[in-house]
Amino acid sequence: MASQDGTTELLSQSVNSTCIPGSTYHVDRGRASSASTPPTSPPLSEVDYTPLLESTQEPRHEYTQLAHSLVKAMADYVGHLQEENLPMPSLEPAAQVHGGLKVQGGVAARDTVVKLAQKIVAMTMDPEMKLFISSLQFHFCSSLKVAIDLRVHELDECFRASSRQADALALARYREPHEADTLGFGLAFNTTANFWEVLARDTEGKRSQRFNRAMRAVNINALEVIPRIYPFNRIGGNGLLVDVGGGLGQVARAIMATNQGSRLQRCIVQDVCAADDVLEEVLESNRKLGVELQRHDFFDKQPVTGASIYFFRHIFHDWPDRACVKILKQIVQAMGRDSRLLICDQVVDDEPSIPATLYDIDMWTLFGGKERNRSEWEALFRAADERLYIKKVWTTTEAPTTILEVCLW
């Protein structure tokens, strides 16, 4: 009896993959045959497994016995699914979860399959390692450290915003986000202002402190890796790097310090708060490395024209496509013939990993932003200016950080 996906036939072949004493079935390379009858496979529920399980000349090892018991249990479970007209188990997203089995025997058969499979896994990888993994000790320890380092217990904005994102999605009628949309963040905190505006209005500074601590944790490894991803020491033009939205110059200082004495001679760090209450020690560090701060909103006209590099790190994933196009248009107008646009952001796979997907949801919930794959980046550049194209995507084995090198035709 063949099932929708051939599972029944496959199990039948597994059971009859050898000569079974007392049965009429002989299998040669998966083909059942008999001297007097045409090849056929019996329904799983009608297969007699007793000869198979007892047909050994010496005691069967427990490990092998488990395998045969698992096949028998799976066949029993399949039989119950067929009796209740339920589909075969599958990993497909739309697959039905078999929590609605009506016959108790089917539930018991399913539980037996799970228990046998778990025991086989434990014996295959050794019981000690299985206990370590199943108890999640490594997960708890590593997660606790991350939670403490990031002070997750203080991330009020993220958790409350996530709880309302489904409502925000319904309000937007399930389309791509726009700048003016009400997000989960807005619903959670009853505000029409975006995250950055709320952060700027934080008179007590608690939100700003939480955000800055989180960013410091994110930057721990990135500051060392970024200067090595792209050959900043070989840039052409006037040797000027403009770090747009670069805060107080953390990344810029790392890039300049790594490329002392190269063609990279000067750096301007632009941010809306670049001149607010900057510590003297920060200003001194910047001056020594040729870094200067400039107040600038990247939605406004770019005041520095013809720079060798316009650098954006973790900016575009904070904004929806329409806002990103506005930012890019300002840069295109300022770029010279030899200018390069460097975007340090994720380029996710077409089938993104779970962490990348969760990060994408975070950006969407808080900012209306998104993580993008290569085709989405290309579409974004075309929407800003048909002349923009990706020359190269720079990657490293040290970290998942990526730099897109974008030029004008």
Swiss-Prot record:
Sites where the protein binds S-adenosyl-L-methionine: D271
EC number(s) stated in the UniProt entry for this protein: 2.1.1.-
EC top class named in words: transferase
Catalytic residues in the record: H317
Gene3D superfamilies listed in its UniProt record: Vaccinia Virus protein VP39
Domain of life, per lineage: Eukaryota
GO MF term (any one): O-methyltransferase activity
InterPro entries to which the protein is assigned, alphabetical: COMT-like (IPR016461), O_MeTrfase_dom (IPR001077), SAM-dependent_MTases_sf (IPR029063)
Pathway(s) served: Mycotoxin biosynthesis
Signal peptide start and end residues: none
Start-end of Polar residues biased regions: 1-21
Region entry Disordered, spans: 1-46
GO biological process annotation, one example: secondary metabolite biosynthetic process
Result of knocking out the encoding gene: Leads to the loss of pyrichalasin H production, but accumulates the tyrosine and phenylalanine analogs of pyrichalasin H, called magnachalasin H and cytochalasin H.
PANTHER family: O-METHYLTRANSFERASE ASQN-RELATED (PTHR43712:SF5), PUTATIVE (AFU_ORTHOLOGUE AFUA_4G14580)-RELATED (PTHR43712)
Family the entry assigns: Belongs to the class I-like SAM-binding methyltransferase superfamily. Cation-independent O-methyltransferase family.
Functional description taken from the UniProt entry: O-methyltransferase; part of the gene cluster that mediates the biosynthesis of the mycotoxin pyrichalasin H, a tyrosine-derived cytochalasan that inhibits the growth of rice seedlings, but also inhibits lymphocyte capping and actin polymerization and alters cell morphology. Pyrichalasin H is indicated as the responsible agent for the genus-specific pathogenicity of M.grisea toward crabgrass. The first step in the pathway is catalyzed by the O-methyltransferase pyiA which methylates free tyrosine to generate the precursor O-methyltyrosine.
Protein name: O-methyltransferase pyiA
Classification lineage: Eukaryota, Fungi, Dikarya, Ascomycota, Pezizomycotina
